Amino acid sequence: MDEEENHYVSQLREVYSSCDTTGTGFLDRQELTQLCLKLHLEQQLPVLLQTLLGNDHFARVNFEEFKEGFVAVLSSNAGVRPSDEDSSSLESAASSAIPPKYVNGSKWYGRRSRPELCDAATEARRVPEQQTQASLKSHLWRSASLESVESPKSDEEAESTKEAQNELFEAQGQLQTWDSEDFGSPQKSCSPSFDTPESQIRGVWEELGVGSSGHLSEQELAVVCQSVGLQGLEKEELEDLFNKLDQDGDGKVSLEEFQLGLFSHEPALLLESSTRVKPSKAWSHYQVPEESGCHTTTTSSLVSLCSSLRLFSSIDDGSGFAFPDQVLAMWTQEGIQNGREILQSLDFSVDEKVNLLELTWALDNELMTVDSAVQQAALACYHQELSYQQGQVEQLARERDKARQDLERAEKRNLEFVKEMDDCHSTLEQLTEKKIKHLEQGYRERLSLLRSEVEAERELFWEQAHRQRAALEWDVGRLQAEEAGLREKLTLALKENSRLQKEIVEVVEKLSDSERLALKLQKDLEFVLKDKLEPQSAELLAQEERFAAVLKEYELKCRDLQDRNDELQAELEGLWARLPKNRHSPSWSPDGRRRQLPGLGPAGISFLGNSAPVSIETELMMEQVKEHYQDLRTQLETKVNYYEREIAALKRNFEKERKDMEQARRREVSVLEGQKADLEELHEKSQEVIWGLQEQLQDTARGPEPEQMGLAPCCTQALCGLALRHHSHLQQIRREAEAELSGELSGLGALPARRDLTLELEEPPQGPLPRGSQRSEQLELERALKLQPCASEKRAQMCVSLALEEEELELARGKRVDGPSLEAEMQALPKDGLVAGSGQEGTRGLLPLRPGCGERPLAWLAPGDGRESEEAAGAGPRRRQAQDTEATQSPAPAPAPASHGPSERWSRMQPCGVDGDIVPKEPEPFGASAAGLEQPGARELPLLGTERDASQTQPRMWEPPLRPAASCRGQAERLQAIQEERARSWSRGTQEQASEQQARAEGALEPGCHKHSVEVARRGSLPSHLQLADPQGSWQEQLAAPEEGETKIALEREKDDMETKLLHLEDVVRALEKHVDLRENDRLEFHRLSEENTLLKNDLGRVRQELEAAESTHDAQRKEIEVLKKDKEKACSEMEVLNRQNQNYKDQLSQLNVRVLQLGQEASTHQAQNEEHRVTIQMLTQSLEEVVRSGQQQSDQIQKLRVELECLNQEHQSLQLPWSELTQTLEESQDQVQGAHLRLRQAQAQHLQEVRLVPQDRVAELHRLLSLQGEQARRRLDAQREEHEKQLKATEERVEEAEMILKNMEMLLQEKVDKLKEQFEKNTKSDLLLKELYVENAHLVRALQATEEKQRGAEKQSRLLEEKVRALNKLVSRIAPAALSV
């Protein structure tokens, strides 16, 4: 039991520790609430909190207090007390509170209930049980309460450890049930031999016929197990059970071993199963033989017993029916195997429910008539029913006894409670009676006082208010005094804070002085080094002699100082031992040696003679220089290593990226080369088609002259239509291309990978190239960019070729018609061609030499209608970008075929002329003009404008005078000069400026092109006689009439041929437009890639420059390292010389020790000040608590005043009652007056009647009497009325005074509340001030800690200096003999 209780207590402690968040072993209110919620004690939570914590919100409890309070609360809730008389009910309540853990048929496992014994055994063992229960009464109620909080985990653990014990419990209970049921012996008639467990077990063994020798074998143990319902045990389980019971290992189980194993849980008690486990042995084991004559008697007795009973109560669910499987299962438990045949023999269906009452009567009938098997089944049923009912009756009897005991205990407790409640009620009644009497007496006195002495009460109220006001004023003065004291303390704390800040400032100043002294020492050290390291010093020998003398003197002084230092150290240790421990400085060391802060001691002792002064500070500076040098060296080495690693990583990354870019560039270049080859093939095909068309045009030009006349307007009309369609289509294609290009550019602008791609394109295709090749590649790129104005060269070639073809046709036609007109026309051709070329070549590369023949090139390549001029401003940058891309893709020697095309055309034109001087023989001016006009420039615009204006202002389109070839050459030379000048400006300017100039040139030239195209279209629609000039009209009048018919036929034929050729030409133009658009897109892409390539090249150059700069810095750092190594060697040699001067440290050791003592004293003073601050803070907290208490007192006073105010209100209400009574009496008196008046009137009326009857004298007398009586009555009424009015006024004045008093009291209370609020605000302000003081104190403590840390650092440095002094002394002792010997 103790182990089980300890287990529960340990579980409770684990839950308790899980709620202990602070780890202190105590729980506050919140943590205790959380613990109760974990233990599912929501109902007991308020009682438990009140029991453990009370009304204190800051109280805490430990585990023992919680355990005691927890058990007490649970026991009080359950109605259980730790007493002798209710320990058994605790045990029964604890056993019945926990349900079984596992149910298997009729077996229940895991319950801790203890089966009750029979009444006789209980009566026999009641005395020892009471003794054992008395020994366990101290913890039974605790276990009952602790079992309620047992976790499921502990139940599962306990289940595994106590499984065997539970089985033994069930076995023990089954033994008793078997003993009572199978053999028909009721529990009340148990023999005395079965009073003990040993006798019961021995009796069972005798009944089973086993254990005759006092021991059980394995087979006999199997029989016993079958008898108690464990017939399903296998051989291995039986062997394990036998080995467990056989503790001595002799191969047998004795009675004591069996009893010990059976009652191992609690051997002092014979336990009984909490559930009814039916014995499963065969019915034949205890069946009464049929031969004996006891069968009928047994049956009759059973029938008589069961005549008023129903069978199958255990399986009856209240409906009177049961499943056949249930009946068969019950019979199989009783050992009857052929239950199905029995049911069928009794005419019951196996598939439907069985009526239990009919089955009972059938069995009852069959019990007397049917054979032995049916009788056995009936007997088994009756036996089972009787045993079940008997168990139920016994259980009810036990429950009745327990309920009776519980009722008796409850009645006892109720009696005690009733007594306590009677006492409480009596005391409460007495108190209430006393209070009521006291209140009645007080109210009576107050009523009497209010009725008689209202003025006195008012004075009393005024006096009370005055006293309260004085008390409040006194409280306010006291609080003001406390506030003044707090302010004084605050000022003191602020002063202390300022003082500490000043001390910190002084320490900082001292540190700055030490730094300045260090700088001074460094200068001295440099001076000494300069002086000492001079090899040509003349006084070196004399100085060594003086050094020897000085060393001897210093040795003597060192001995004296060391003796004195020892004496001071001894005195210091004595003083240190006398000091209290709590005032010791944390930075004190027992050896008593301290170091002075740098710069606080003397400057040192200098050497004699002419040598520079060398002090101890110089030595310190040398040490610092060495340390600084070492730090610099390590930092430099780390930086050098870091930069080397970075440079190596950069090189690796650069090589990797360069290889990737080379590969990607190779792939891109291969793709671009393939595209370029395709475009060249397409260009060659288009040139072939153009040449074929030109030849066809030349063939048609050699035909008869009338054919040319009819063909010209058709050609012009067809070409105008083609030009318009081509212009609209090309404009649409350009818009789409521009939209796609802008989208691609916006998308590609965010892709950094394009930059790598362009860089790869710029790299050479085979491995890394030297810088010379890269430079040459950049030059080539710049040259290609400079050749951007030649982007429209091929279009110019096509325009020139077409214009020349038209010109050849016109020349041939004019030659056949009229020689002079043809000559004039041929002379005008070069001029017109140049003028048109200069006016239109700059925008689209067009060169139409005659207005009538310019439609084809305009329709092909450069549409110039009004729509184009409207979009000139928006399309200018895109045309420039297309020209730039074409310039980048077209190689440098590309202009050669362009100049070759016009030369061929001029060579074809030469034989057609009349004279050799008419047509120029050199084609260079046209090539030059074409090349010059293609380049954009602002300087060319005035010339082009003047030429265009001159050509437009002429009176006629065809000039008859001849122009020599010299004028053409002059114009070509001027154009060549313009081209060179623009080339120079291009080389000087940037690419952006050139593009802007080109845009301006295009904008200036497009209106001319537009006017020209409109004029051409207008002329194409006019009749032939309006299109030609005056010479042409004169030529037409000279034609003969017979030739008109032939010319018409020939013209119709040529017209049909030209229509077919025009259709074919239109298809070719469409294909060329598609290819040109594709080529322009490719050129744009290539131009963009080339720009990105240039940017990446720039980045690459910058990265290389950075690498070169890093390499140069690396070389400089290496040089610095070498210089520092040399300096280090030099410093080592200098240190060997400076080590001789360490003797000067001995003079300053005493001063350092004194300074350390001073610092220790300052630290002790700081500690004392900190203690004072703590004391002041405690005082402030106490004063704050007093202020809070005073505030609480004032709140209590306010509550008292409120109570008095309520009393006054009640008195006012009580005064209102007499006021109402007085008003009622006044009304009654008024009614009486009215009644008197009525009576008076009646009396007067009667008197008048009597007067009439009475004589006049008598009447006069009566009048006088009546007047006298009336006056008296009036006086009395007036007096009564005045009295009533006075009373009313007095009551009204009292009420008003009471209301005034109430108002004054309310005002006073409000003033007090306001004052208390102000006081509370002041208290909060004082709290804030206290918090600020705490913060300042914390800052001061931190500053003190910092000073202490500095002091510790000074002590450490002093120790280091002492060690250095020792080492220097050793060095001096070694060096001094050598110096003296020299």
From Swiss-Prot:
<feature type="short sequence motif" description="D-box">
    <location>
        <begin position="633"/>
        <end position="641"/>
    </location>
</feature>
<keyword id="KW-0479">Metal-binding</keyword>
<keyword id="KW-0106">Calcium</keyword>
<feature type="domain" description="EF-hand 2">
    <location>
        <begin position="41"/>
        <end position="76"/>
    </location>
</feature>
<dbReference type="GO" id="GO:0005509">
    <property type="term" value="F:calcium ion binding"/>
</dbReference>
<dbReference type="InterPro" id="IPR018247">
    <property type="entry name" value="EF_Hand_1_Ca_BS"/>
</dbReference>
<dbReference type="GO" id="GO:0005874">
    <property type="term" value="C:microtubule"/>
</dbReference>
<feature type="coiled-coil region">
    <location>
        <begin position="484"/>
        <end position="579"/>
    </location>
</feature>
<feature type="modified residue" description="Phosphoserine">
    <location>
        <position position="148"/>
    </location>
</feature>
<feature type="compositionally biased region" description="Low complexity">
    <location>
        <begin position="991"/>
        <end position="1004"/>
    </location>
</feature>
<feature type="region of interest" description="Disordered">
    <location>
        <begin position="857"/>
        <end position="969"/>
    </location>
</feature>
<dbReference type="GO" id="GO:0005813">
    <property type="term" value="C:centrosome"/>
</dbReference>
<feature type="region of interest" description="Disordered">
    <location>
        <begin position="144"/>
        <end position="164"/>
    </location>
</feature>
<feature type="region of interest" description="Disordered">
    <location>
        <begin position="982"/>
        <end position="1006"/>
    </location>
</feature>
<feature type="binding site">
    <location>
        <position position="246"/>
    </location>
    <ligand>
        <name>Ca(2+)</name>
    </ligand>
</feature>
<feature type="coiled-coil region">
    <location>
        <begin position="1046"/>
        <end position="1375"/>
    </location>
</feature>
<dbReference type="InterPro" id="IPR002048">
    <property type="entry name" value="EF_hand_dom"/>
</dbReference>
<keyword id="KW-0677">Repeat</keyword>
<keyword id="KW-0493">Microtubule</keyword>
<feature type="binding site">
    <location>
        <position position="250"/>
    </location>
    <ligand>
        <name>Ca(2+)</name>
    </ligand>
</feature>
<protein>
    <recommendedName>
        <fullName>Ninein-like protein</fullName>
    </recommendedName>
</protein>
<feature type="binding site">
    <location>
        <position position="248"/>
    </location>
    <ligand>
        <name>Ca(2+)</name>
    </ligand>
</feature>
<dbReference type="GO" id="GO:0034454">
    <property type="term" value="P:microtubule anchoring at centrosome"/>
</dbReference>
<feature type="short sequence motif" description="KEN box">
    <location>
        <begin position="495"/>
        <end position="497"/>
    </location>
</feature>
<comment type="function">
    <text>Involved in the microtubule organization in interphase cells. Overexpression induces the fragmentation of the Golgi, and causes lysosomes to disperse toward the cell periphery; it also interferes with mitotic spindle assembly. Involved in vesicle transport in photoreceptor cells. May play a role in ovarian carcinogenesis.</text>
</comment>
<feature type="domain" description="EF-hand 3">
    <location>
        <begin position="196"/>
        <end position="231"/>
    </location>
</feature>
<comment type="subunit">
    <text>Interacts with gamma-tubulin and TUBGCP4. Interacts with anaphase promoting complex/cyclosome (APC/C). Interacts with CDC20 and FZR1. Isoform 2 interacts with LCA5 and USH2A. Isoform 2 interacts with DZANK1.</text>
</comment>
<keyword id="KW-0597">Phosphoprotein</keyword>
<feature type="domain" description="EF-hand 1">
    <location>
        <begin position="7"/>
        <end position="42"/>
    </location>
</feature>
<keyword id="KW-0206">Cytoskeleton</keyword>
<dbReference type="InterPro" id="IPR011992">
    <property type="entry name" value="EF-hand-dom_pair"/>
</dbReference>
<feature type="compositionally biased region" description="Basic and acidic residues">
    <location>
        <begin position="150"/>
        <end position="164"/>
    </location>
</feature>
<feature type="binding site">
    <location>
        <position position="252"/>
    </location>
    <ligand>
        <name>Ca(2+)</name>
    </ligand>
</feature>
<feature type="coiled-coil region">
    <location>
        <begin position="384"/>
        <end position="424"/>
    </location>
</feature>
<keyword id="KW-0963">Cytoplasm</keyword>
<dbReference type="GO" id="GO:0005829">
    <property type="term" value="C:cytosol"/>
</dbReference>
<feature type="domain" description="EF-hand 4">
    <location>
        <begin position="233"/>
        <end position="268"/>
    </location>
</feature>
<feature type="binding site">
    <location>
        <position position="257"/>
    </location>
    <ligand>
        <name>Ca(2+)</name>
    </ligand>
</feature>
<dbReference type="Pfam" id="PF13499">
    <property type="entry name" value="EF-hand_7"/>
</dbReference>
<keyword id="KW-0175">Coiled coil</keyword>
<keyword id="KW-0832">Ubl conjugation</keyword>
<feature type="coiled-coil region">
    <location>
        <begin position="616"/>
        <end position="699"/>
    </location>
</feature>
